[in-house]
């Protein structure tokens, strides 16, 4: 089977690896701006995951001509009015590490008994004939502390407890997490649609 190329608008090696794992069984190969040697840093100015995802996919399609997709994802905490949401990667200010951002969130949430949270991912796709988006979510709880021992995941995974696993995402190997992840759910919807236009 000949591999088909899709351009993925991300500079995150973690996300690219996760997307490639999800796409390879379907015969798709991912290229990124980094792989193509293209400078790529569009400003994410929208207030929704959908809006920010489209900023990236439209710009990558404009630059490369490849069918392009992007994701915008983050974590939303009920007791914080949906924060950090679209600001997940910048929560707490510039220059913070993933761990610092997670600790900042824990501190902001404090002892609030409402620990409900969800990860959201919106995947948008743009080519000459289409502009579509798909959303996936995974519901969980914010733990009371930061998992220093977990070997897996990234971002807010060390504080995101997934009741169905009885574990935090940082304690779950990528293959297992990918079965339920917000990104996988959005990608499944995308792939289901994408195969109908082939």
Swiss-Prot record:
InterPro entries: dITP/XTP_pyrophosphatase (IPR020922), ITPase-like_fam (IPR029001), RdgB/HAM1 (IPR002637). One of its GO terms (molecular function) is nucleotide binding. Its cofactor is Mg(2+). Binds 1 Mg(2+) ion per subunit. One of its GO terms (biological process) is nucleotide metabolic process. Keywords: Hydrolase, Magnesium, Metal-binding, Nucleotide metabolism, Nucleotide-binding. Substrate binds at residues 10-15, 73, 154-157, 177, 182-183. The active site is at 72 (proton acceptor). Belongs to the HAM1 NTPase family. Pyrophosphatase that catalyzes the hydrolysis of nucleoside triphosphates to their monophosphate derivatives, with a high preference for the non-canonical purine nucleotides XTP (xanthosine triphosphate), dITP (deoxyinosine triphosphate) and ITP. Seems to function as a house-cleaning enzyme that removes non-canonical purine nucleotides from the nucleotide pool, thus preventing their incorporation into DNA/RNA and avoiding chromosomal lesions. This is dITP/XTP pyrophosphatase. It comes from Leptospira biflexa serovar Patoc (strain Patoc 1 / Ames).
